[in-house]
Amino acid sequence: MEIGIVKWFNNAKGFGFISAEGVDADIFAHYSVIEMDGYRSLKAGQKVQFEVLHSDKGSHATKIIPIADTQE
């Protein structure tokens, strides 16, 4: 599993991109692979854990799990 930060996520379209250390290109993120209860969405700057699949269309995230901010 990789750890990354959400660069941006469009709730209306249901997708966005994640950046991760050691990965040159941004990683595509789709709402359908976000693992959480309720409305599945991400916010820019949010820390997430995920797996990466590589295809001819680029890298995309699977099994995206938001990481709770424990600094509150």
Swiss-Prot record:
SMART domains: CSP
Cellular component terms per the entry's GO annotation: cytosol
Record SUPFAM superfamilies: Nucleic acid-binding proteins (SSF50249)
Main localisation: cytoplasm
Entries under Pfam families matching the protein: CSD
GO MF, one example: nucleic acid binding
UniProt keyword annotations, A-Z: Cytoplasm, DNA-binding
Compartments in which it is found: Cytoplasm
Domain CSD: 4-64
Annotated CDD domains: CSP_CDS (cd04458)
NCBIfam families xrefs: cspD
Designated name of the protein: Cold shock-like protein CspD
Organism, as annotated: Haemophilus influenzae (strain ATCC 51907 / DSM 11121 / KW20 / Rd)
